[in-house]
Amino acid sequence: MKPLKTLALMLALALTLTACGVISSDDGPTEVVGASQPAEPQETVQPEETAPQPAGKDPIQTEPVRVGALKGPTAMGLVRMMSDDGVNSYTLAGSADELTPKLIKGELDIACVPANLAAVLYNKTEGQIVTLAVNTLGVLYIVENGGEAVQSMADLKGKTLVAAGKGSTPEFGLRYLLEQSGLDPDKDVTVDWKSEHAECVAALAAGTADLALLPQPFVTVAQGKLGNGLRVALDLTAEWDALDNGSAMITGVAVARRDFVEQNPELVDMFLKEYAVSVDWVNENTAKAAELVTANGIIESAAIAEKALPHCNIVCLTGQEMFEKLSGYLQVLAAAAPESVGGALPRDGFFYGV
């Protein structure tokens, strides 16, 4: 991509990408290269056999994959790989706009980003982004501090809530559900948008907000700070499912540069196989996984990480299953707000392995 075009693209993305918050604030991305922690005991999970290689191909990975992820559920599924892996490099960031310029410039090969942002990037790069996997299903909740006024989406009329993720899954998911409940998101509900989810937790703790839109693990973090006074008022995934619209709420995906995928198909397949093993291990070994989550700076407290992990909906869906869930979700978003997917639905080349 020519330098001027790349610069223009990065400036446009800076206006449309939003933060998917960080629990411990950092000044910039965290680089994790190789094994950041000693490997966990191997008897808990047996790695899958390496797929047979074509004649002349070396089955041992020698080229590193440069991976970026957001500090939250999208990175939590990677922690087994981050701790066992001596080849790949990992960059953790507090917001998508820290990762996407690196992906576009070729400084990252794979990035874990909000689901709708994958479609936005596909359109802005004229098809140069491929989605490899769905890595996080619905994790969004409305929480209420010190009250029980909100029992349904309709009860949000006239209310003010704090949220982060404007221009991303939190905003478009909330807007869609409000509209389906007969509310005008621009008139009936006031949203005080913050740059990070941690700011929403701080507002609840300071008493300057009573309602917040939060994803896991930030819900668990907030409950740890505020105790029993903070309750989950609405599960937005359940609200979405109740509409029976043929789709599922998707929070995060893993995407890659098309040139990287086309030049390294065996490497991509190996990465996805190891990713699936890591996700399974994280979901089955939450105590050990929580220690790695903390060691890699994703959440400060292992105890909070352990409580949050079962609610983070961490998955690794690839191929046809990825296509069915993600395409349905993007279709719903596009019908409600075309700008949420970058103006048009991606074509089939957007989905890896389909």
PLM region spans:
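Secondary-structure end/capping motifs
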Residues: 261-336
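C-terminal motif of bacterial Sec signal peptides marking the signal peptidase cleavage site
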Residues: 17-19
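Conserved C-terminal helix/tail region of periplasmic/extracytoplasmic solute-binding proteins
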Residues: 327-354
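Positively charged n-region of N-terminal signal peptides that target proteins for export
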Residues: 1-11
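Pocket-lining segment of extracytoplasmic ligand-binding domains
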Residues: 116-117, 125, 198-292
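Bacterial signal peptide processing site
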Residues: 21-24
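A bilobed periplasmic-binding-protein/Venus flytrap-type ligand-binding module shared by bacterial periplasmic
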Residues: 80-81, 140-150, 248-266, 318
